[in-house]
Amino acid sequence: MEQQPLTLTAATTRAQELRKQLNQYSHEYYVKDQPSVEDYVYDRLYKELVDIETEFPDLITPDSPTQRVGGKVLSGFEKAPHDIPMYSLNDGFSKEDIFAFDERVRKAIGKPVAYCCELKIDGLAISLRYENGVFVRGATRGDGTVGENITENLRTVRSVPMRLTEPISVEVRGECYMPKQSFVALNEEREENGQDIFANPRNAAAGSLRQLDTKIVAKRNLNTFLYTVADFGPMKAKTQFEALEELSAIGFRTNPERQLCQSIDEVWAYIEEYHEKRSTLPYEIDGIVIKVNEFALQDELGFTVKAPRWAIAYKFPPEEAETVVEDIEWTIGRTGVVTPTAVMAPVRVAGTTVSRASLHNADFIQMKDIRLNDHVIIYKAGDIIPEVAQVLVEKRAADSQPYEMPTHCPICHSELVHLDEEVALRCINPKCPAQIKEGLNHFVSRNAMNIDGLGPRVLAQMYDKGLVKDVADLYFLTEEQLMTLDKIKEKSANNIYTAIQGSKENSVERLIFGLGIRHVGAKAAKILAEHFGDLPTLSRATAEEIVALDSIGETIADSVVTYFENEEVHELMAELEKAQVNLTYKGLRTEQLAEVESPFKDKTVVLTGKLAQYTREEAKEKIENLGGKVTGSVSKKTDIVVAGEDAGSKLTKAESLGVTVWNEQEMVDALDASHF
């Protein structure tokens, strides 16, 4: 029976229902980290809302989840005055500073006080304004009196609620930051693309929020912690600790690592604890914020011209060390970017021994004037990546000479060039052995074709011996050829051959990612595969068709089209097809959702222990292709735990929660019985 078109009244009602439902699911996923539905359930409802808003554009509201994805290109940022100033905090750098702060507070109040201690997130200070519970404005701190209006960019940050659980009008303050893992991935991508890298996660967050293209912001995986209210009039809390609880209750993401301390000794113990834990956190912190807990006492203490008297920010000492640059090595990535690395005298920084640091590109070396045998200060950016922070010029030898940049590829000796005003040097020889080897490494990697046994050493041997010249050649190798490689005996050769042949059955998104198309990551590859269905169809797609997809911008679209315009790519596709490598998407496409029959459909599954018949990745992929979701931890939301050999604490927790437990064979039987 043909579905009747919606009336305006019906569309209005349904859009309201969908917005409420989707905002709740988003809050559970991004703020509480407790998703209650599978991704594709959310996606299906989201698509329904998009369709309604497309047909009835007047129904689009500021709190609609469709307004998060970005797509607007802004001409600039308007000024955003703060009715209530965003004060900075006085800093403390030692135990003496913190104890002196406590002494001043107790002297002014006349009694001991309790303190609320919170982690000082190293991001960008933001202010969020809500009217009747709906997000209407987001701004940067600026000078504390006037910031910049970044509302459209903050709409793309998933942990910023579009609508609160209470219809109150309130302005809250907090920090927008970039998680460490996202920071590393972003810099790797920028380095590979010849762009300037960010010095640290704070700069990355700030730079992202000041992007004029909101679609770029949406891809940056920013997050937030909210920690105070500009005016507590609409709030019930009487203390800072209660305020954080209340902020969480009405929909904001707050940091759970806070602690209420009854004395300054407890405060110092908290500081020492998180100074040790700092490197284990998934986000960057640069200190601890200490606030008098009771608002009545805060009011009594008041403010100076610049800062509150009732709070102080303890700043951690920098994790840095001095060493000597002994050499600068250059390596070539799969897209031809030539990256310099400083080889240094080993030194301890942030608990680890460091002897190498990325110098990113030639401009970085020239900007800092880094030379061989220079004494330098290094630190860990985001507690992760060793960076050269400073050159100690006063210790430089009198006969020191500026570092001479390479002009030719260290591997194939082709001339190095700058493309399109990139900061990176590139080798543009498509036959460069280093690029081909890196491309082979990428092709067999875990998120690509996932071929076990083919590490960089083995692949380099294959190339050097003339066994492979491109990725398609892998599929024509024989076991006898594999046994000609160093340290590859009959059993290893058989294992590698079996792994290569098995990868032919992968769903095509792995192949798309493995081909190394510039700017196309694993997520974009899956979006492309799901929409176009197979590689030949994708190869014929126009930039307009590609850019119309959610989360796919012009850069990716142009890159994909350019890639498939190359005749050598079509020859490679023909060879892959000849080798019977699967070129189609095996996952669940939107139009097939209703037809799926599987015990895994709509279920949350956890895999634990050793599996004999599949690798963990293979099992995960098969379950997700049938509409299930595989997560890494057991909770009340888990439907099935598959327990392999030597299953440990996850099995114990599943049993204690009464979650259904399957052995591996039950999982295999369920996979075999599934179809769509």
Swiss-Prot record:
EC number: 6.5.1.2
Coiled coil: none
Gene Ontology biological process terms, A to Z: DNA repair; DNA replication
Domain BRCT span(s) in chain numbering: 595-676
UniProt entry keywords in alphabetical sequence: DNA damage, DNA repair, DNA replication, Ligase, Magnesium, Manganese, Metal-binding, NAD, Zinc
Cofactor(s) essential for the protein: Mg(2+); Mn(2+)
Residues that hold NAD(+) according to the record: 39-43, 88-91, 118, 141, 175, 291, 315
GO cellular component: cytosol
Catalytic activity, as annotated: NAD(+) + (deoxyribonucleotide)n-3'-hydroxyl + 5'-phospho-(deoxyribonucleotide)m = (deoxyribonucleotide)n+m + AMP + beta-nicotinamide D-nucleotide
Signal peptide: none
Function comment: DNA ligase that catalyzes the formation of phosphodiester linkages between 5'-phosphoryl and 3'-hydroxyl groups in double-stranded DNA using NAD as a coenzyme and as the energy source for the reaction. It is essential for DNA replication and repair of damaged DNA.
Protein's UniProt name: DNA ligase
Gene that produces this protein: ligA
